[in-house]
Amino acid sequence: MRKFLRVNSPIILLENYSAAIPKPRWQVYGERYAERRAINKSFEFTWPQYQRKPLNQLLMSSLIQQTDSHCSYCDAYPLMSADNTIDHFKPKSKYPIEVCKWENLYVVCAHCQKEKGVNYDEKLLRPDEQGYDFYHYFYYDFTTHEIKILWGLPEEEAQRAETTLQIMNFNHPAMKESRRLSYEGFADRPDFPPNHKTHRFMFE
């Protein structure tokens, strides 16, 4: 999981919903979803429409920009059209108010969307949180192509690293194979554009 810097929230989420409802649009969307969930726990979320377009389509370009078209979690590249899904870091079923909050939205590949699913823990590391760095918590085993927890971490940090590996399932066989292929394909190509490599943290 490679660190990235989150860009500022698109103005569409921060603007007041209307003159009659002077609250940020993301908050109104979240409150409405929470109200419907309170009435019906099986109510399924659909992205709100803004000017006749689904909100997720309007946010996607900004989400992709901040990761250089890589998956926010595993750093897979390039994201295909089927991969362009938005993960709610805090699951919308448990945190409905944050369903459209900018800081809760991450563009991810289909694999990471499936593996993380609705799993969440407060210890879970975020790739854009202040102070996060891959090599502060993990190291890469170039023999097994596994991501492993760095030795000697303070207990709290070690727990966060372990929680992240478990929830994200970064050592799934498909992930290890993807990293192996990436390493073998790019290890001898130092001049290849860095942002066009998949799993960039291996080469840094």
Name every feature range the model reports, one short phrase each.
Residues 1-9, 110, 116-117:
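Flexible coil/loop and intrinsically disordered segments
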Residues 2-3, 15-73, 95-99:
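Short, charged surface segments at domain edges that flank catalytic/cofactor-binding sites
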Residues 44-46, 128, 170-172:
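Generic amphipathic, hydrophobic interface segment in small proteins and small subunits
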Residues 73-107, 119-132, 136:
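Histidine-centered nuclease catalytic patch
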Residues 98-113, 135-157:
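Short Fe-S-cluster ligation motifs
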Residues 116-118, 146-149, 169-176:
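Substrate-binding/catalytic groove segments of enzymes
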Residues 156-204:
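C-terminal, charged low-complexity interaction regions
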